[in-house]
Design a protein with these regions (language model features):
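Helix-rich terminal scaffold detector
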Residues: 1-79
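Non-DNA-binding regulatory cores of transcription-related proteins
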Residues: 87-154, 160
Length: 160
């Protein structure tokens, strides 16, 4: 009875710990230099976590602890492999990938964001993805231009 229970538990745990892959964006994997460095760091951290999990003696716990790092290794390895590093813009005439743009909204709020790759985007830290609606409406525009979609108007105040 105990052997059958152990085998059943192991098989059940194994199937539970095979996590589905993280979704990969269909968009080109554009990144800044810092974005590539961050992806490489996250890949290294996932590998270290996986290696630490492999040192656990109990097989079911080892599988549980290795599941997330293994999924992250697959994701970050693919993101590093497909990364297209875009150099910082050489001009502040128009909004481009890597630009920091300050704009005002119709309600008077003034916001500043840097336009970066999808994996680097963190609106709370001041960066948005180049595929976000706000970034799409600003790319290619100049100071004084109005971008936006629908009822959302954004006037560009500065580009750095």
């Amino acid at each position: 009875l105990s052997v059958a229970f152990t085998k059943e538990e192991s098989a059940e745990t194994a199937s539970e710990t095979l996590l589905p892959d993280r979704p990969i964006s269909p968009h080109p994997n554009l990144v800044t230099e810092a974005g590539l460095t961050s992806l490489e760091l996250r890949l290294r951290e996932a590998r270290e976590a996986y290696e630490a999990a492999q040192r656990i003696d109990e097989i079911n716990e080892r599988r549980r602890q290795a599941a997330v790092p293994l999924r992250d290794i697959r994701y970050f390895a693919e993101r590093v492999r497909t990364a297209q590093v875009i150099p910082d813009p050489t001009s502040t005439d128009t909004v481009a990938f890597g630009s920091t743009v300050t704009f005002s909204r119709a309600d008077g709020r003034v916001q500043t964001y840097r336009i970066v790759g999808e994996d680097e985007a963190d609106p709370k830290a001041g960066s948005i993805s180049f595929v976000s609606p706000v970034a799409k409406s600003l790319l290619g525009k100049s100071v004084g231009d109005v971008g936006g979609s629908g009822t959302q108007e954004l006037e560009i105040i500065s580009i750095a």
